[in-house]
Amino acid sequence: MDPNTVSSFQVDCFLWHVRKRVADQELGDAPFLDRLRRDQKSLRGRGSTLGLDIETATRAGKQIVERILKEESDEALKMTMASVPASRYLTDMTLEEMSRDWSMLIPKQKVAGPLCIRMDQAIMDKNIILKANFSVIFDRLETLILLRAFTEEGAIVGEISPLPSLPGHTDEDVKNAVGVLIGGLEWNDNTVRVSETLQRFAWRSSNENGRPPLTPKQKREMAGTIRSEV
C-alpha cells in the first residue's frame, strides 16, 4: 500500500476528530456540521477499503500534525494561507432538506464513477427541480456535497451523492451524473429543471427553462437501463 495513502488517511481522521470537538462545543455552523457528517461516512468507507482502524489512524494522524506544527513558524503559516485559494460553500437546500430521510416505491440505483445516483421510478408526470449543496472555487463547482430532486410538493424523488469509498470527483463527473438522473426522470414523463445556482457553476450558463446542455448519451443512459428492467 502506498505510504502516502496511509498518511493522508491518518491525517484526515485526526482533523475530523478536531472538527468533531469543535462541533461538540457548538462552534460549527450548518455547512460545517453538514460536511462533518458527510466526511464521517467517507472516512468509514476509506477505512474499510484500506483495512485500517480509524481510532489507530487518528492517533497516528495526531503525531503527524503535531510534528508539522512544531516545525511551522507563524510567518510560514501566513504565507501558506495567503497562497491557497478560498472555496465557497453554496446551498440550494436547507439543512432539513439535506438531512430528511426519504424512501422509494420503485427504487433505482446507478453508480456513475465516484457518484451514486438514486431515483424513484414510480414518479410520473411531475414537475421536478434539482437542488444541490456544493463548494465552488475559481467560480467553478469544486465538490458536490449532495444533490436531490424535489417535486413541487416538496417530496424527494431522486438523489446524487459522492461514494464514501471513492473520494474525489470533478465537475464533469457531476454534470454526467445530473444528465443521467434527468434522463431517468424524464423517461417517466416528468419535467425536470436544474437550479440556477447549479447551472451557473457547473455549466457556467443559465437557461430560462432550467435545462443545462446534456449529451444524448447522458439522457439515454439511465432511461435505457430503466426500459430494460420494466
Curated annotation (Swiss-Prot):
Cellular-component GO terms for this entry: host cell cytoplasm; host cell nucleus
Post-translational modification as stated in the protein's UniProt record: Upon interferon induction, ISGylated via host HERC5; this results in the impairment of NS1 interaction with RNA targets due to its inability to form homodimers and to interact with host EIF2AK2/PKR.
Residue numbers covered by motif Nuclear export signal: 137-146
RNA-binding and homodimerization: annotated segments: 1-73
Keywords for the protein's UniProt record, in alphabetical order: Eukaryotic host gene expression shutoff by virus, Host cytoplasm, Host gene expression shutoff by virus, Host mRNA suppression by virus, Host nucleus, Host-virus interaction, Inhibition of host innate immune response by virus, Inhibition of host interferon signaling pathway by virus, Inhibition of host PKR by virus, Inhibition of host pre-mRNA processing by virus, Inhibition of host RIG-I by virus, Inhibition of host RLR pathway by virus, Interferon antiviral system evasion, RNA-binding, Ubl conjugation, Viral immunoevasion
Annotated compartments: Host nucleus; Host cytoplasm
Keyword Ubl conjugation: yes
Main location (coarse class): host cell
Molecular function as annotated in GO: protein serine/threonine kinase inhibitor activity; RNA binding
Region PABPN1-binding, residue ranges: 223-230
Basic and acidic residues compositional bias, start-end: 218-230
Family statement: Belongs to the influenza A viruses NS1 family.
Record note on domains: The dsRNA-binding region is required for suppression of RNA silencing.
Name of protein: Non-structural protein 1
Organism this protein belongs to: Influenza A virus (strain A/Henry/1936 H1N1)
